[in-house]
């Protein structure tokens, strides 16, 4: 039931004070004026509280249970982050206030930028992008600006591996590049010979995730970087999987020129359901002049915004990023420290490999090498034997109170699950997950229809996902309309 269906004429939740603002007689154009009052639901405060409390109880979250969503790093978000981000000094300021009264916020963002540069091995960084894909687009615009500044107008191609995130080719295309797909080698990694075939004087950039989306570290990354640079192209780092290498190595040390980070993954800020996220973009020195405006600078112990950058790609959004998310990431990094962040990477890899070995006794691992933070498993054999698909297993997991792993991605593996346990899960949780998974496989063999018709315990069972995607209903339809 929606909030509109609870509406009853005359019910009120809050009485607004009388309007004492003088009418200055602004003459707005007719096309900007509302023709009729908004159709707001008329409900009591108790109705509202019960409605949204019940909806919240139906949600699944990291605070509820295991959330092994591959390539998403659904780690626990420490509550100290929330506590400090809610301090009045952060929540009651506005971006339009003069810098004299926002020095604390500016200092926090400046220091966060410096810390992220150190963690990633970059020379400069912007915190403005609102999400990972927004960071990707920003990085691609920087790559384009770099080549155009050199008069290198032929470079219109972006190489993207076939195992890459779907946002990689989308971001490259939005920036005006032609996307060229690079086929993975038999081991799931970049094949240097195959890469050489695609590199020429029309290639602007190669986009990579390392570890890649199969959870495998690109062992030839130094050679890859040298090869890309030899041909005059740039190397771009998708930071989705940075969690695995924290404190061990840095994208900048591998030879990457541009990197975007996902604060809502690696640095424990909440994510899911569309945001808010944060996708800072770091660059090496030769690309710093192209970073978007404004940039945060420090002059004589005063923090301020600098808009005077003649070769900048310009504005990429209003104001300066999702500030409250930046506060949470700052708190996380300060709390963990260098040793703590290194331990994060170690435990993420340890948990993933422990779970990989356990799951390998239930279904095949697509690439059986030691993984980093995640791995890809396939139930293709079970599907051929019983007709039970990865989607069915994912739905059945919901009945056992576990969020399904990422399914059918990467696209180069059939009937697959991409599983990322993160560093914050205990051995007990991982053992319980494998017990449940094993039980579902037994169910699939003994009673396939049971699994094919799951879930049974969720408020909504199987959605018509195709219709929801192609014909979304984004507003309430009143009967008289």
Curated annotation (Swiss-Prot):
Record's GO cellular component terms: cytosol; glycine cleavage complex
N6-(pyridoxal phosphate)lysine sites (modified residues): 265
Substrates-to-products reaction catalysed: N(6)-[(R)-lipoyl]-L-lysyl-[glycine-cleavage complex H protein] + glycine + H(+) = N(6)-[(R)-S(8)-aminomethyldihydrolipoyl]-L-lysyl-[glycine-cleavage complex H protein] + CO2
EC number(s) stated in the UniProt entry for this protein: 1.4.4.2
Disulphide bridges, residue numbers: none
CDD domains: GDC-P
InterPro entries on file: GcvPB, GDC-P_C, GDC-P_N, GDC_P, PyrdxlP-dep_Trfase, PyrdxlP-dep_Trfase_major, PyrdxlP-dep_Trfase_small
Domain of life: Bacteria
SUPFAM superfamilies per the UniProt record, alphabetical: PLP-dependent transferases
Cofactor dependency: pyridoxal 5'-phosphate
Keywords: Oxidoreductase, Pyridoxal phosphate
Catalytic class of the enzyme: oxidoreductase
PANTHER family assigned to the protein according to its UniProt record, in alphabetical order: GLYCINE DEHYDROGENASE (DECARBOXYLATING), MITOCHONDRIAL, GLYCINE DEHYDROGENASE, DECARBOXYLATING
Protein family: Belongs to the GcvP family. C-terminal subunit subfamily.
Subunit record text: The glycine cleavage system is composed of four proteins: P, T, L and H. In this organism, the P 'protein' is a heterodimer of two subunits.
Name of this protein: Probable glycine dehydrogenase (decarboxylating) subunit 2
